Amino acid sequence: MLERIQQLVNAVNDPRSDVATKRQAIELLNGIKSSENALEIFISLVINENSNDLLKFYGLSTLIELMTEGVNANPNGLNLVKFEITKWLKFQVLGNKQTKLPDFLMNKISEVLTTLFMLMYSDCNGNQWNSFFDDLMSLFQVDSAISNTSPSTDGNILLGLEFFNKLCLMINSEIADQSFIRSKESQLKNNNIKDWMRDNDIMKLSNVWFQCLKLDEQIVSQCPGLINSTLDCIGSFISWIDINLIIDANNYYLQLIYKFLNLKETKISCYNCILAIISKKMKPMDKLAFLNMINLTNELTYYHQAISMNPQIITFDNLEVWESLTKLITSFGIEFTIIIEQVNDDQKLDTLYKQSVISNVDSILLEKIIPILLEFMNNEFDSITAKTFPFWSNYLAFLKKYKASSPNFVPLHKDFLDNFQQICFKRMKFSDDEVTQDDFEEFNETVRFKLKNFQEIIVVIDPSLFLNNISQEISANLMNCKNESWQVFELTIYQIFNLSECIKNNYFGLNKNEIMTSQPSLTLVRFLNELLMMKDFLLAIDNEQIQILFMELIVKNYNFIFSTSANTANATDDDEKYLLILNIFMSSFAMFNKRENVRLRSWYLFTRFLKLTRINLKKILFANKNLVNEITNKISPLLHIKVTSINAQGTDDNDTIFDNQLYIFEGIGFIITLNNSSQELTAATANTPIDYDILDQILTPLFTQLEGCITQGASPVVILECHHILMAIGTLARGLHIGLVPENQVNNMVVNKKLINDSLIHKFSNIAEVILVTFSFFNKFENIRDASRFTFARLIPILSNKILPFINKLIELILSSTDLKSWEMIDFLGFLSQLIHMFHTDTDCYQLFNQLLTPLINKIHSIIEEIDEQHDQQSSSNKPIDTAVTATSVNKNIVVTDSYRDKILLKKAYCTFLQSFTNNSVTSILLSDINRAILPVILNDLVTYTPQEIQETSMMKVSLNVLCNFIKCFGNGTCLDNDDINKDPNLKIDGLNEYFIMKCVPIIFEIPFNPIYKFNIKEGSFKTMAYDLARLLRELFIVSSNPTTNENECVKYLTQIYLPQIQLPQELTIQLVNMLTTMGQKQFEKWFVDNFISVLKQGQ
């Protein structure tokens, strides 16, 4: 049998075995595991001398698996494993063997013993092996090992002692490690085991560790892992054992630990052990006494002196050791800050006593701990600097909170704050080691951002100190930057940026109306001006960090750069600065930079700067008539659109370049129209001829390129190039529009008509024609359809109702497409809703949609049918997924498949489109002779839902709102919307009221109460739906009222047909009708949800 297992295990682990062979071998091994004598078989596999390490490992792993199963976890089986494995282990560890077992096998043996411990130790396991620790200590001759201090001690005995320690560590990890999430039952069991250990074995273990620490140094050097494992045990167990077992009155135990602080092999374990000891949870005053008693700062004085005298003592070779030491000292300091917080929050303590304790702890920190941590923070290694950050966060938060507690509080800390800020300045600088973008980003994330946050806290604590220090730092660097490295100049710009952020966020605590005239703001303005005066030096710099940071600084602080006199004719300084900034942008420093990331970022920032400084730019354009031409000529090389290669997805490999290139088109469009929109300066009107010929300089190359694409034919590269050109034209139009019309008026058609000149309309009429021609050639390609919709949407505000003839043709071409995707229809419906909103009072627009509605609805249904077919195919090919979704649909928006998701999104867009008719008072379109045939289809879409669609509450909300509004607008068969200028008062559709009643009433009652809809009234989204159903019923009641006969068809249908049909009790029917007829809208909705649906749902 053992040979057979060996063959099977080898087959599974042989990389040359095929999948079928491995699967068969695994099945056969599983069969052996399930046999009655499985434990005996795999014990034999482990202890057999002929078994190799792989077989032993597999055997041990299988034993763990078998012991944890209910069938094998019986006393006889566990005792068998215990007896055989311990007997074999004694020979393996203590026998005079030439070689010891490899670590991975020793770890697996520890896991087997830990499993036995968890299943047999303490009364929660029936007291099967309460002598666990005694037996293993005897097995490994622990007493002999720790009592023999002779250097000739048997090495195997020391290895056995080390193994015992590691076993204890694994046990502690199993019962006390807080990083694992355990069940409540498991946690209770672990607590029971820990209680049993405290009562019976912890003192023994503590004595073992104590004796290990007393071993002769020569023995320690013979087996350094023994001391490390001992220290690890103390550090691991200390969180839940009695601290007095480790800390005695004479600190003898602790002094034994301290002696390993300076031993090379044990330093890290020693640091971690002490860290765990000082982190032991205690009451604040007990913790303070404890921290003072252990006298750790005296033990660490050596390291403070060493690093202060020779910072180069830290090298890459010993970096891990110093990181561990820094973490220890940081944690030591944090413990004191925790004491401060706990004392302050203790309501039982006297205020004066609190102040005394806090002052005492603060003095300890300032005198003994902070000087050491400042040295570590000032070290050149980022990892060591970062290790100190948790303490600084706590301590600065303490200073910020208590700065107002006494007049002398801040002065007492002034030296610290001054030193700390100086170190922040130094450590914020990039080092020569940071050479790649990844290096810079890592430094920013791990070091610089934290230091920036610390600076911001210092501003709040002592504004004058911060401003004085940062001003001196920036001034000195600006003065000497030409002689310094690029890192110094980059840091200078970064600190100016930080100063501006502190001002904007008002960390200085100024009155809002005083911020712009305050000393910090004046200081910032001075630095910004000095930077701009260094133009020649700036342009000569070839460093991407400086280039990007400078542009960000200028754009985000434009309001500080330009004074409040920017609107006056005498503000020549501001004009010069503005032109200077434009020239910097339009140079190799920025927009023509050789580095792609700088170029792309500058293109965005350039346009952002233009839009933010609209007032300044308009004034400068008015004073410099040729400036627009100069700007256009300078940046025209950047306007050329080129598709160099295309990937498998049909997109440009350089899509990022094009996406950012669009910002330039928007920016140049903004400048052109801003130049011609100075009403207050030129008194221009829409009828005044304005020269927009400069647009030809931009558009003509694009049109020529489009013509070339049409001539070449529909290759993937050509199609993508056409897409890019159309997107560029649309983005240019957007820039032209926002340059002409104030941002808060962009959607006001009256303002648009007033400000948009006829010459511009003529230009864009030609553009619309060109787009249509291009679209007619390539309308079967979805990215061309997408770009055409995008561009036409940007032309609408400019052309206003003059775009309708072009829109008509565009819609025809889109609806004629045979492969229209669902997402395209969704976007298209949004585009049409925008048209309805903007031109709902226009007769031509009304006629356009009157003709369009029927083919549009048919197209939507065609796409939905295609989606349903795809969904059926997906469901049939993957039935388990569909079943699982149906079973878990309760109370959630379920996405069954991609096709189902597409259908839901399309139906929601469809309902939103229908909503635009009621929102803009054009519902008469639905009642017209042309659309009367499609109206039943539309209404059926609104009253038909599947159970899964009911779970899509966001879609249902839109659908029910549309249904309510339809009933409100034409629920009795005539158009009831008085704001609808196209309604025909003589037109009436007979039977429409009866249709709404017969279709909607069942919806109102079935959705909440039919179990197939899984309606959970307690969930917010379903409760909202219930309010919509109540509103629907109320609208039905209102529209069904007949003032002539005083009858209401809705009430009649409820009382005589539907409610008796569903067997609603008579008293509830009477109550419902009474509330429906007497309550107002909001009152009825609340009653229907809280007193009708909710009450009846409780009885289900």
From Swiss-Prot:
Q: Record's Pfam families?
A: Exportin-T, Xpo1
The family line of this record is:
Belongs to the exportin family.
The record's subunit annotation is:
Interacts with GSP1, GSP2, NSP1, NUP2 and UTP8.
Q: Which UniProt keywords apply?
A: Cytoplasm, Nucleus, RNA-binding, Transport, tRNA processing, tRNA-binding
Where is this protein primarily located?
A: nucleus
Protein name per the record: Exportin-T
**Per UniProt, what is one GO molecular function of this protein?**
tRNA binding
Q: Which InterPro entries match?
A: ARM-like, ARM-type_fold, Exportin-1/Importin-b-like, Exportin-T_C, XPOT
GO BP terms: namely: tRNA processing; tRNA re-export from nucleus
Protein localization: Nucleus; Cytoplasm
